[in-house]
Amino acid sequence: MRLRKLKSLKHNGKRLTEILEAHERFWKGTGTRADLTGADLSKADLSKVNLAGAILRNANLEGSDLRGARLPGADFTGARLRKADLRNTDMTEASLAGADLREAQASGVEFFRCDLTNANFQKALLRNVNFRDAHVDGAKFTGANMGIAILRETDISKADLTGVDLSTTLMPAGYGAKKQGA
């Protein structure tokens, strides 16, 4: 699969490279926050880009490469990230409510304090991820690979974990006792 380069992408008539440069300056107090709401970033090479705090609501990132990207506090509400490569990204406090992450490669991702309400992680690769203190109500993890995932301090009672092997997952305190007593 061939990925699209940043310089070839546009959103609302602006080159993506210009939007990202302004976003970098935003953190220094002189630019503007990247608003990529509804952007078509499918199959894009976004590896190692800084999208911390960016707005990507309902954006299409299917099949994109986001490996090593900086994504803390980004808003991916309703975004399509199916088959995206998110390995080793920091998504601390990002919002992925209602996002589609089916079959995403997300090993090593930091989902600390993320809003994952109603996110779809079906058949995603989620090895060595940190879901600590994340909100996962209504999230679907059916068939996901969650080996060595951290779910401590996370209320998983309203998440769908059907078909997930949790034998190596660090679970919330008392999870096994609650499950056995149910």
PLM segments and residue spans:
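Tandem repeat scaffolds
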Residues: 5-182
